[in-house]
Structures are given as structure tokens and as C-alpha cells.
């Protein structure tokens, strides 16, 4: 009886974790940081996790935006919001803001957290080990 209850509780916890993970994956995406314009906050090799949407964007947020010539997009910090609602951006390592403010419809997402260089690899290796141990 106790064993059946323990199995049921574990199964419920796994289902809950799977539901949370599915929701997070549907609402967030991972972006590889490929350059140094956001250093020291983000450096090349970091893995940035961004949430979809533009709600609640404010000065100081780091956003992923579409930029011509940059297929993966650009991660830069919001330094101002213009009178017409466009975002003035600047990379933390850049001395001046980007030339053209971007409209909200160019925003792909807002930075939620990041995994520093090396930690991303370790995280996914650990995740793979956990999944493998559960399957065997």
C-alpha cells in the first residue's frame, strides 16, 4: 500500500515537472551569445534564455531583436523608449547606442536568465545524464 502511494506521488511529480518544462519550452527559447557587445553581462559562448513577447519591456531590460544581417538576432539592452514607442538599444560594451531605434514588432523576446560559458555545456550534460538514468 505504501509502495503504491509512493509510486503514485512520484508519477504525479514527474507529470507536474513535465508540464512545467513543456510550458517553459513553449514560452521560452535558448539563444547562443555569439559576440562581445554585451560584455561583461553576457559574453560569447553564454546561453541566453529569452521569453517570448514584448509585454512589460522597460529601460534596462535585455531584448533579442531582429536586425538585418544578423540571422540569429541581436541581444542588446534597452536604454530608452522613444516618443513613438520604439526601443533605443545599446550593447553594454558599445560606447554609443545603436543607430536606429527598433519597433516593438522587431523584438523576439526578453532575457530571463543566462547560463555562463561552460555552465551551459555542464547543464545539458547533467540533464542528459538524468534523462538517461531515468530511461535505463
Annotate each language-model stretch with its function.
Residues 1-136:
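Extended hydrophobic leader/signal-anchor segments used for secretion and membrane insertion
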Amino acid at each position: 500500500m505504501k509502495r503504491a502511494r509512493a509510486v503514485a506521488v512520484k508519477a504525479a511529480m514527474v507529470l507536474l515537472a513535465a508540464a512545467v518544462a513543456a510550458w517553459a519550452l513553449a514560452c521560452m527559447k535558448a539563444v547562443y551569445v555569439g559576440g562581445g557587445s554585451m560584455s561583461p553581462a553576457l559574453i560569447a559562448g553564454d546561453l541566453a534564455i529569452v521569453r517570448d513577447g514584448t509585454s512589460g519591456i522597460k529601460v534596462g531590460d535585455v531584448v533579442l531583436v531582429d536586425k538585418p544581417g544578423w540571422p540569429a538576432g541581436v541581444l542588446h539592452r534597452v536604454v530608452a523608449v522613444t516618443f513613438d514607442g520604439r526601443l533605443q538599444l545599446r550593447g553594454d560594451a558599445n560606447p554609443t547606442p545603436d543607430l536606429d531605434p527598433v519597433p516593438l514588432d522587431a523584438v523576439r523576446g526578453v532575457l530571463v536568465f543566462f547560463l555562463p560559458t561552460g555552465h551551459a555545456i555542464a547543464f545539458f550534460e547533467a540533464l542528459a545524464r538524468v534523462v538517461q538514468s531515468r530511461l535505463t
